[in-house]
Amino acid sequence: MDTFKVQLQEFFSAGDGADDAPCLDAPNLLEHQKRGIEWMRRRERRGRPHGGVLADDMGLGKTLSVMRLIANDGDDAHKTLIVCPLSLLNHWTAEAKKHNLPLNLRQFHGGDLDESFDDAKAVAITYDTLRAHHKHYKTAGRASGLLARHWHRVVLDEAHVIKNHQTGVHAAACALSADNRWCITGTPIHNRHWDMYAIIHFLRCRPFDNVGVWRMLNRNNDTNRIKSVVNKIVLKRNKAEIALDIPQHDVQDVHVRFDEAEARVYNELKSASQRAYDDAVASADKAGGMQDVLWLLCRLRQVCCHPALTKCAAMFPEHAHIFEPAYESSKCRRALELVQRVLDTPDDKVVLVSQWVEFLQLVAGLLRRRGVPILLYTGQLRVEERTAVENQFNAADSPYRVLLMSIKCGGVGLNLTGGNHIIMLEPHWNPQIELQAQDRIHRMGQKKRTYVYKMIVDEENSIERYMKARQDKKLTFVNKVFDRTALNYEDIKKFFSL
């Protein structure tokens, strides 16, 4: 208990007071970026742990802030290791060159860190490369390469990748040795407080990196106690409070109603889902039964978009026509109306987002039949092809004013400020992923007012209506956690009866 009390006191008392570091040499930065870098430097010198979470809204220049932090290291400092998704690896290199920063940033794809990396101030790798090294380490029984080196700083970009603390990628990140540990993500919490625990465990944020302490802290889902920890180690600013010159951002729900045939198909699949659920509850093989339920729930979501996605045409021969790819479902018709409205406004562009590539391809076919030139941005594209699509869409003189994007590809590192409208074709279980996609257009560099249209089938028993309610509940929880009013050290001591 004495150790626990000491760790608790150190956590809440460290990091306060003036910084004795020399003035920051960071030209061409915005004021919020300068303040952010000073906060990071202060945490590296005085914080417990040494590091934290930079969680500014997407599009506020977190990457450049971190690179400026690295650039201001002394020449005698050890290297910084940057871990990021594959889609962002070239982005880090390009940004360093664009801003002429003396990082000599090198990409590492495996093997050993030989002498060719000696002059690099920063090394960038992917999460997959890190995980592979850790897997080899566990097999060989000894550290090598990345894991054998002690780093001055480790930076996890899009750190929510490690949000499950029971995964291999989380274990690999935690195995890295470093003086300073940083998580960069606009969305530290996606669904639940355990997402935050995974980050705290990586940061070695004692005593809260102990799973038992964290579980007790979150007893009864009391967000006040979580906030007391989060506020100490997280810097999170949104676009509104920074008052950047980013035009207004409007979000609206677009309600869709089924036609008669779609309603019939939906209701029959809904009844089948209910029967499958009842059978699963009564079955000895609950896990297998619940897989059937989840499959049917996915079909319900797909019916809301286009019946053809369900592959259930044989069940409804009397409504075979609505399962044809050329059929304009109720949601497709409404989406096409929104697209046409954008195209009727000179120079405006629109991004359509879905989690199903097949649905994007259906919508693309409907648009092509109307003579609309379109671009597709999905995981099927190579990295260089993605860059080409991004540049084509953003170009002022481009004939392409409509881009269809997989939500999985639209979450990280993508700048689509050439567009100013975005249509979310269906709700996602994780609202943070939706927000990431929306911020592809609403970010620094945007010159126009932006519009988000969230399409929802608003029938009484619609799964999309249920998902919308779940999203609102999750966002309320996240907003409470990052609210800056929180318990203090004395409050936390009382809770743990110290």
Swiss-Prot record:
CDD domains: DEXDc_SHPRH-like, SF2_C_SNF. Residues 43-206 form the Helicase ATP-binding domain. GO terms for biological process: DNA repair. ATP binds at residues 55-63. GO terms for molecular function: ATP binding; ATP-dependent activity, acting on DNA; helicase activity; hydrolase activity. Belongs to the SNF2/RAD54 helicase family. Keywords: ATP-binding, Helicase, Hydrolase, Nucleotide-binding. A motif (DEAH box) lies at residues 157-160. InterPro entries: Helicase_ATP-bd (IPR014001), Helicase_C-like (IPR001650), P-loop_NTPase (IPR027417), SNF2-like_sf (IPR038718), SNF2/RAD54-like_C (IPR049730), SNF2_N (IPR000330), SNF2_RAD54_helicase_TF (IPR050628). It holds the Pfam family SNF2-rel_dom. This is Probable global transactivator. It comes from the Viruses. The keyword Nucleotide-binding applies. Its EC number is 3.6.4.-. Residues 337-493 form the Helicase C-terminal domain.
